[in-house]
């Protein structure tokens, strides 16, 4: 991307769908390179909006609203920064010739736990814990019996771990299934049931890609360990 002058005709422009703390940091870096920035989120005065050139407050699940903003702004690229986005809108933006980063297919898979699990375990063949998909308490009970208690239950789609619980015995299935559905994004009643494994630590491994000399380079950042005393990340 070539450098430009924000707010002038022909300026380079990026639009963020989601304007949280991560989006704010990205917007600041983009502005240092002379990029015009647009922040979109569901609530006003989100962190990214505090530094962006322009902001929009809309329901992030409103497909038509997202498309209308993109058509108005005509950004060089749209960046998906949060999980709660209408992924169909991203697909339509690509069809309109607007670049989406990451691409709409990748975002759709990453935001859907069933598609992500299938891609990781069945397509890429990454070793994972035992798992099953279910749409009713009866199917969850069968999955837990096959996998063995305790089990994790998660909504097909949600954000920030909402709706994740551990099922220790069959009597808990009905209530914890409803808990998962209550926090689900959209109208899906599908859940993922997973083998529960007690772990000593949790690592985040970040990858990033960039283009250079006509090619794409993929690199990995050193793993970051998380600690959660009293359930709070550190």
Model features per residue range: what roles?
Residues 109-203, 208-234:
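Active-site nucleotide/adenylate-binding loops and adjacent lid/helix of ATP-dependent enzymes
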Residues 1-106, 110-111, 138:
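ATP-binding N-terminal substructure of ATP-dependent carboxylate-amine bond-forming enzymes
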